[in-house]
Amino acid sequence: AFAGILADADITAALAACKAEGTFKHGEFFTKIGLKGKSPADIKKVFGIIDQDKSDFVEEDELKLFLQNFSAGARALTDAETATFLKAGDSDGDGKIGVDEFAAMVKG
């Protein structure tokens, strides 16, 4: 799904680094997969993949399964990790992350 945007080796390494519950840190993950240095268009493409229901927002249930976008066998995020991830990205407080919020979070 991320061919031409992200390298498989970077994705594998990033997933390995947060394999244990409680170890997911979105900033580190975005850096490890190489997303931080990507163009706004590429970041928008990645957002479109994560936005599974195509609502133009990433909601809490989609964040919980965030890692599975990168590998079907990846774990779900814990409730605490999901809440932290949502809080970090949801700058307008509407309970979901829009594409601009996602881009701002990726750029850190």
UniProtKB/Swiss-Prot annotation:
InterPro entries per record: EF-hand-dom_pair, EF_Hand_1_Ca_BS, EF_hand_dom, Parvalbumin
Residues annotated with N-acetylalanine modification: A1
Disulfide cysteine pairs (residue numbers): none
Pfam family, one: EF-hand_7
Keywords associated with the record: Acetylation, Allergen, Calcium, Metal-binding, Muscle protein, Repeat
Coiled-coil ranges per UniProt: none
Keyword Metal-binding: yes
Highest taxon of source: Eukaryota
Binding-site list for Ca(2+) 1: D51, D53, S55, F57, E59, E62
Any GO CC annotation of this UniProt entry: cytoplasm
Annotated ranges, domain EF-hand: 38-73, 77-108
GO molecular function: calcium ion binding
SUPFAM superfamilies: EF-hand
Keyword Transferase attached: no
Residues reported to bind Ca(2+) 2: D90, D92, D94, K96, E101
Note: Is regarded as an important allergen.
Family: Belongs to the parvalbumin family.
Role played: In muscle, parvalbumin is thought to be involved in relaxation after contraction. It binds two calcium ions.
Name of the protein: Parvalbumin beta 1
